[in-house]
Design a protein with these regions (language model features):
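Basic, Lys/Arg-enriched alpha-helical interface segments
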Residues: 1-62, 108-109
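Enriched for short, Lys/Arg-rich terminal
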Residues: 71-75, 79-109
Length: 109
């Protein structure tokens, strides 16, 4: 089954931030483009079998069906809806960040 992949405003902002950090802070625009391409390719691959990646292990996110897609040093956090055939990308972040804290901030917004 083919799913529609929707990127939230926050996830879009996350992707822009990743690009800007690598391109401008690390002064590596080529690497920034490559990393963004890898992330986008993996995100778009969620149109098929989005349940193939592990569920996030902590509540309340586990009950909501949140899943984790690792992409090199980053994680894509998303929720697949099998009834509507939609995958919603919630966040894209560096894997070394405090994911719980970032999800809590996302919930409060």
């Amino acid at each position: 089954m083919i799913y529609e992949v929707e990127v939230s405003e926050q996830a879009d902002s996350d992707l822009r931030g990743i690009f800007e950090y690598i391109a401008f802070e690390l002064q590596s625009p080529e690497n920034a483009s490559g990393q963004l391409d890898r992330l986008e390719e993996q995100i778009l691959s969620l149109d098929t079998m989005p349940e193939r990646y592990r569920k996030y292990e902590k509540e309340p996110w586990k009950s909501r069906g949140l899943r984790v897609l690792p992409v090199y040093n980053y994680v894509v956090l998303y929720i697949p809806d099998s009834d509507k055939k939609v995958v919603t990308i919630l966040r894209v972040m560096y894997a070394g960040r405090d994911i719980d804290n970032q999800l809590n901030l996302h919930t409060k917004q």
